[in-house]
């Protein structure tokens, strides 16, 4: 197993053990480094058909991503990564993807793929390529706050900053709050892509 795959599996399992991934809740994606792609290239499947992403991400054209599968349970990733995960490749337009590894029992990448990729494109630009992970978890305490606080960026930011001293360090520019939306579509991808950290 490659080190980046081991790290991905550990992160997914750590989140599951925290109680952040009920059933098939949440998703995770990692943008591979060029040297990682070359290291695993012999293990990749033959190129298949291109599938539309549903959004355009030209800043990610030709890149590879390790992603969780749609409907897959985080608790099972550590047991059977080839069933639960996929490595996908984007085409040269950033409009289509194809599966190059994983999902051996069928399936597709996370239904939140458009959101993940739009956020990866933003983070890549903002951090000069340093930022490589998008993680969507159902953190119980944060979910509870959505029932007692107004859904306002500044109010949420202040409450989170006051709740743990590390929060201002982790997200010094605050968080963005997106109201309830149907997951997995273009609209939620656009809404989350214009924020640095999203609740």
Regions found by a protein language model. Name each.
Residues 1-199:
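Glycine-rich flexible loops
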């Amino acid at each position: 197993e490659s080190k980046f795959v081991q790290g991905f599996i550990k992160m997914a399992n750590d989140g599951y053990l925290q109680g952040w991934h009920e059933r098939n809740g949440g998703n995770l994606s990692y943008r591979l480094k060029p040297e990682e792609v070359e290291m695993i290239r012999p293990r990749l499947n033959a190129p298949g058909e291109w599938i539309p992403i549903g959004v355009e991400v030209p800043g990610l054209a030709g890149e590879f991503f390790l992603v969780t599968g749609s409907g897959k349970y985080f608790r099972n990733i550590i047991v059977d990564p080839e069933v639960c995960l996929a490595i996908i490749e984007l085409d040269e337009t950033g409009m289509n993807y194809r599966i190059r590894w994983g999902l051996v029992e069928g399936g597709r990448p996370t239904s939140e793929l458009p959101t993940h990729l739009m956020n990866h494109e933003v983070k890549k630009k903002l951090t000069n390529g340093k930022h490589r992970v998008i993680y969507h978890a159902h953190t119980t305490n944060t979910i509870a706050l959505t029932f007692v606080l107004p859904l306002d960026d500044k109010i949420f930011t202040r409450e989170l900053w006051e709740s743990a001293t590390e929060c201002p360090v982790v997200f010094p520019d605050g968080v963005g709050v997106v109201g309830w939306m149907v997951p997995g579509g273009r609209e939620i991808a656009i809404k989350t892509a214009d924020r640095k950290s999203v609740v």
